[in-house]
């Protein structure tokens, strides 16, 4: 894979990560890999090299999609006895393992949601900065299953995801408003909670989250608004924050009077200390489990 192809792969994952979130991007990528094995058209001895080239590039995307990297690592370990098998057996085993990984990932996400709905209470005013699939499903299940009445403040993020979230809330008749994130200060008295998802949680206890999360969380903390982060354990990274490869872009901006260079980052790094409650597939993560994770 040449430099341009790697840049295109980065852009592809960055776009899907921003629009779909890390959870749905992980499932989509695994299903795409299943289709790729199904359509293999090469010599048997070429397969591992081709897979390894693609997997290496995926694991090096900016930012790193931690759950997808974990899934690929498990897949590679389970495939070790099968890379030398004939093409039909190799293909069948690869598809079987990958399908099981999709099921495993989805089952952990569903368990997070089951625990998460316990943190939505009657009369809550909930801020949603970037509605990950887990956050969206927590809200839906709290309404549909627990029959809770609450309202949502949706912070405008992008032209794709924000309308999707607003439509979902509208369809479920969940009271909500959509506002620019920079106007949140005018609405803090209407909220008591903020629900968040994450691309990853690092071993030095940083959260890789959508851009703007750190500013929003700081304002919430200043105003006594409790924060809840939902992330199944596949989002917990082996690495530290500086290994997460957050994408940095530099762009020359020209005006009528001057030209300046604008530097932006694709995601925020948030101190886990800013989060009041972390929920994974086993429920609320207590300090003992966090200490075990940090090693």
Regions found by a protein language model. Give the residues of each.
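Long amphipathic alpha-helical segments
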Residues: 1-97
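Non-catalytic, soluble scaffold/interaction modules
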Residues: 56-84, 100-105, 109, 114, ...
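Ligand-binding beta-strand-loop-alpha-helix segment within the catalytic cores
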Residues: 77-122, 150, 154-194
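Gly/Ser/Thr-rich loops at beta-strand to alpha-helix junctions
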Residues: 125-136, 159
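Histidine-anchored nucleotide/phosphate-binding helix
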Residues: 132-145, 217
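Conserved phosphate- and dinucleotide-binding cores of soluble alpha/beta proteins
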Residues: 144-146, 155-295
């Amino acid at each position: 894979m040449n430099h341009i192809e790697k840049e295109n792969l980065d852009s592809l994952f960055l776009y899907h990560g921003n629009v779909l979130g890390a959870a749905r991007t992980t499932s989509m990528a695994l299903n795409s890999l299943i289709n790729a094995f199904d359509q293999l058209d090469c010599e048997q001895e070429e397969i591992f090299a081709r897979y390894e080239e693609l997997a290496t590039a995926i694991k090096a995307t900016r930012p790193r999609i931690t759950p997808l990297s974990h899934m690929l690592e498990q897949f590679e370990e389970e495939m070790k006895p099968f890379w030398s098998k004939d093409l039909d057996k190799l293909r069948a085993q690869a598809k079987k393992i990958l399908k099981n990984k999709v099921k495993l990932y989805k089952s952990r996400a569903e368990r997070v949601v089951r625990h998460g709905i316990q943190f939505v209470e009657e009369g809550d005013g909930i801020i949603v900065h970037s509605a990950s699939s887990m956050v969206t499903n927590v809200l839906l299940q709290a309404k549909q299953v627990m029959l809770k009445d609450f309202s949502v403040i949706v912070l405008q993020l992008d032209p794709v995801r924000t309308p999707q979230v607003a439509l979902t809330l509208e369809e479920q008749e969940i009271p909500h408003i959509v506002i620019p994130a920079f106007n949140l200060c005018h609405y803090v008295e209407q909220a008591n909670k903020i629900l968040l998802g994450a691309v990853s949680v690092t071993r030095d206890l940083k959260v890789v989250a959508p851009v703007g999360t750190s500013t929003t969380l700081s304002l919430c903390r200043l105003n006594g608004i409790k924060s809840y982060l939902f992330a199944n354990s596949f989002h917990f990274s082996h690495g530290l924050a500086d290994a997460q490869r957050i994408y940095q872009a530099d762009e020359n901006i020209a005006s009528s009077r001057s030209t300046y260079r604008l530097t932006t980052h694709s995601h925020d790094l948030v101190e886990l200390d800013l989060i009041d409650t972390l929920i994974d597939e086993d429920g609320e993560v207590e300090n003992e489990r966090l200490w075990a994770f940090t090693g």
